[in-house]
């Protein structure tokens, strides 16, 4: 559309702005075509720019390639540095796939230390495909090879959370963690639709005026109409759209309704609810196992953060509290044998819990050839046994 399109959009905002009305403009981009002119425009008009980058070069270039099959990392970083040069506000969006999900700390620390961002989003890649590996609408139970695996995604989030909660609370903000904190505090909205009880507020407007229920459901069955024919406010209020949002709650399987972390998850995004429970009920989220592990893992620190904030104290005070707890546990572990019960109270032997472990750092992968075949993975029912 070009820069002139956005200049015209700003002109129309100014023309029709009513007293007391404010506009917030955001734009998501991979940054590869940014130049000084674009960045000057963004700065002048207070745009918030989301940059799509999937971690260090080896991880980013695994899937983010240009038409020639070449990695785009250098061009993305060039665009990012231009935003920084012009003082444009930006944040980072990372798609979590089956490759970079195995390197959570490398991704997080790269964004924090090399990119220099203090706000991150981690979006799981879950793509449904047919027998030929072609992308489908909301059908079937097979996913593409690059789709992150459920427990793999849970480990990704958990590992980053442990780094963040001990070192970066108050200085780095991770969207999933912020939403979780809101739900632990019992707020009416987490600020993130996938973790709210109902949804329907994140509609998608196409260039031709067609309005869809959600940007994950830009499909014929979810076309609400065209804003050239009907006012947008009327389309948003239609029974079709209200039902779409309410279905997020009404279609939860019994396993979700009985789940101890339902308040934090709410079944996540409806687009990912295509597996079945152990009892055969449809509508279980493909990522259920990972989210369950993540939300149960963060329960203790989230309760501390909640109590701090409700007392009017900064959430960052959780860091020294957890550091003291860790030191006390380490001292207790040192006093027991490997085969004794772990002092943490898990009921496991120390060697299987908080005992010393050998760690081996895995090297970052080389970029996959773009012509490499992409085998499929079939989703099976997720058992209630956690």
Language-model-derived ranges and their functions:
Residues 1-59, 66-78, 82, 94-106, ...:
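Canonical radical SAM enzyme core domain
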Residues 62-74, 81, 85-194, 198, ...:
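Radical SAM enzyme [4Fe-4S]-AdoMet core and its adjacent flexible, acidic
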Residues 213-216, 253-271, 290, 341-355:
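Local cysteine-cluster metal-coordination motifs and their immediate loop/turn environment
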Residues 218-261:
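Membrane-interface junctions of multi-pass transporters
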Residues 243-281, 300:
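Basic, glycine-rich polyanion-binding accessory segments appended to enzymes
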Residues 272-288, 303-310, 357-372:
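Short cysteine/histidine-rich metal-coordination sites, predominantly Zn2+-binding motifs
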Residues 313-386:
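Acidic/negatively charged segments and metal-coordination signatures
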């Amino acid at each position: 559309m070009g820069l002139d399109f956005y200049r015209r959009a700003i002109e129309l905002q100014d023309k029709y702005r009513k007293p007391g009305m404010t506009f917030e403009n955001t734009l998501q981009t991979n940054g590869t075509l940014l130049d000084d002119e674009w960045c000057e425009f963004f700065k002048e008009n207070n745009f918030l720019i989301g940059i799509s980058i999937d971690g260090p070069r080896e991880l980013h270039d695994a899937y983010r390639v240009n038409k020639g099959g070449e990695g785009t990392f250098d061009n993305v970083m060039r665009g990012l540095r231009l935003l920084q040069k012009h003082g444009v506000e930006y944040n980072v969006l990372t798609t979590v796939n089956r490759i970079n999900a195995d390197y959570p700390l490398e991704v997080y620390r790269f964004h924090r230390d090399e990119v220099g961002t203090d706000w991150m989003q981690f979006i799981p890649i879950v793509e449904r495909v047919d027998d030929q590996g072609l992308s489908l609408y909301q059908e079937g139970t097979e996913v593409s090879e690059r789709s992150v695996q459920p427990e793999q995604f849970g480990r990704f989030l958990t590992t980053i959370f442990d780094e963040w909660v001990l070192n970066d609370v108050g200085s780095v903000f991770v969207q999933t963690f912020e939403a979780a904190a809101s739900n632990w505090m019992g707020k009416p909205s987490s600020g993130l639709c996938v973790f709210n009880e109902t949804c329907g507020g994140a509609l998608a407007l196409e260039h031709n005026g067609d309005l869809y229920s959600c940007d994950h459901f830009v499909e014929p069955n979810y076309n609400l109409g065209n804003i050239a024919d009907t006012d947008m406010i009327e389309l948003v209020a239609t029974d079709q759209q209200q039902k779409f949002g309410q279905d997020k709650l009404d279609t939860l399987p019994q396993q979700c309704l009985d789940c101890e972390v339902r308040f934090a998850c709410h079944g996540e995004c409806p687009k990912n609810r295509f597996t079945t429970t152990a009892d055969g009920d449809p509508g279980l989220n493909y990522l259920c196992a990972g989210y369950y592990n993540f939300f149960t893992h963060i329960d203790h620190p989230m309760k501390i953060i909640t109590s701090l904030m409700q007392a009017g104290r900064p959430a960052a005070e959780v860091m020294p509290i957890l550091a003291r707890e860790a030191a006390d546990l380490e001292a207790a572990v040192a006093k027991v044998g490997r085969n004794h019960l772990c002092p943490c109270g898990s009921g496991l032997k120390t060697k299987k819990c908080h005992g010393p472990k050998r760690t081996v750092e895995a090297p970052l992968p080389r970029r996959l050839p773009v012509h490499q075949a992409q085998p499929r993975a079939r989703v099976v029912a997720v058992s209630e046994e956690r």
